[in-house]
Every structure is written in structure tokens, then in C-alpha cells.
A protein has these predicted regions:
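Acidic, proline/glycine-enriched N-terminal capping motif
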Residues: 1-119
Length: 119
């Protein structure tokens, strides 16, 4: 499945959900909510789904560990996905957030419908 988006945010449909890649990292978590929300509104229109979801958020960085709280980043990104990927963030049954050293500064989000989740 091919990626959509030419700027900082790209996304693609995957089985049961969506995968999002955001290039670069800033220390301001609130920066990500409008960035991702507008991307879904303008470039990657999908209908939100019901049922339980599993979300994996990985922040990759190069060099020093960024001064960005993962919990604030997760909240901003989940708020941006609400109404696009899932109807409400209360549908998230499993959430994994991780910060790892990587090859470049980026954030990856994978949100998939839970296989044995409720409808």
C-alpha cells in the first residue's frame, strides 16, 4: 500500500487501520495535533471506525534524547486521529508509546482495529 502525503506527514492504509509517519521532532507536543488533523482533513480522508483499537507510537531520535514527554505527544496525536481513524479515543484498548534511538528524527504511529475487540 502506497504512502500519501508530500510534506512532514505521510500515511497509508494497512490491514485493519492506518500507519502514519511524521518527519522531524519538536519539543512542543501541541504542534502535532493541528499538523496531523489538517493532514487527515485535506490529504488523507478516511471514515472513522467503531470497535476497539490498538495504537503503537514510536518516537525515533538522533543524538540527544529530545525533551518531549511521550504522554503529551500521545495525547496530541490521539486527539488528532479522533474523528478520522476512530470515532473516539475511548476506543483505544491498547496503547504502546516508546522512544528509541534511530536513523533519523521521526514519529511513527500505527493504529489498527483490535482483532478480538468489541464491535
Amino acid at each position: 500500500m502506497t504512502w500519501t502525503g508530500k510534506g512532514k506527514v505521510r500515511a497509508r492504509a494497512i490491514e485493519g487501520g492506518v500507519e502514519i509517519a511524521i518527519d522531524g521532532i519538536t519539543t512542543q507536543a501541541r504542534y502535532y495535533k493541528p499538523l496531523v488533523y489538517e493532514f487527515f482533513r485535506k490529504e488523507f480522508e478516511i471514515r472513522p471506525r467503531y470497535g476497539e483499537f490498538e495504537v503503537e507510537l514510536i518516537m525515533e531520535y538522533v543524538g540527544e534524547v529530545p525533551q518531549l514527554d511521550l504522554d503529551n505527544l500521545a495525547k496530541a496525536l490521539l486527539d488528532a486521529l479522533k474523528g478520522h481513524v476512530f470515532v473516539d479515543d475511548s476506543q483505544i484498548a491498547r496503547l504502546l508509546c516508546e522512544r528509541v534511538a534511530g536513523e533519523r528524527d521521526r514519529i511513527s504511529v500505527r493504529a489498527v482495529k483490535r482483532v478480538n475487540g468489541s464491535e
